[in-house]
Regions:
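Zn-dependent metallopeptidase/amidohydrolase metal-coordination segment
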Residues: 117-193
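Midchain, well-structured core segments that form catalytic/ion-binding scaffolds
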Residues: 1-125
Length: 193
């Protein structure tokens, strides 16, 4: 556990020394025993991603080095298992145009009075500013003239290197809602989410 803790400290400092779009997430996945005893084994799961595959690989190797260094500091051993490494999305303009044409045929959302009031409360309590229904987008944005790069690699972006793929971005919460925020969770359980 001490080595895992030291690794996490190292990775948290590493955040200042990687590209701005690099994201490093982790969790402990296997620790047991009472709180006053250092367990003999600990495991963490790291998820490293960015908008470019090369930056993801570089940051992943640096995270691995944090694990190796922590093992050296504590006189323990480390086993590293690389499960996957996501590439950036491969743009496909032809498929995007077909997809957009079909989206233009789809009905736009219509919100109930209850959903609009809920959105107003969320916007107010989460400090998002503005007022519903302006906070509830009901249209279709124009198709971008150039591909919009994703901030991070995903499983879909990996697939796009094997088969043609596009990704849809849809409004499913009040404008300005941060994704990793209680307001996003609250809206996911409501009709607007």
């Amino acid at each position: 556990l001490d080595a895992a803790e030291l690794m996490n400290v190292g990775v948290n400092y590493l955040r200042e020394h990687v590209a701005d779009d690099v994201r490093m997430h982790y969790t402990y996945i296997n620790t047991d025993g009472p709180a006053n005893v250092v367990p003999p084994y600990a495991a963490t799961n790291y998820f490293v991603r960015s908008g470019k595959w090369e930056r993801t690989l570089d940051a992943s190797e640096r995270v691995d080095n944090c694990a190796r260094g922590a093992a050296l500091m504590t006189g323990t051993r480390v086993e590293i298992e690389r499960v996957t490494c996501n590439k950036e999305m491969k743009p496909n303009r032809a498929l995007a145009e077909v997809f957009y044409e079909e989206m233009q045929k789809a009905p736009v959302p219509e919100y109930t009075e209850e959903e609009i009031k809920f959105a107003e409360k969320i916007a107010e309590n989460a400090g998002l500013g503005g007022k519903a229904p302006e906070e509830l987008f009901t249209g279709l944005e124009p198709l971008e003239s150039e591909p919009v790069p994703l901030a991070i690699g995903t499983d879909v972006s990996d697939v796009s290197h094997t088969v043609p793929a596009v990704m849809l971005s849809a409004a499913c919460m009040c404008k300005g809602t941060p994704l990793h925020h209680w307001a996003a969770t609250a809206q996911a359980g409501m009709g607007i989410g």
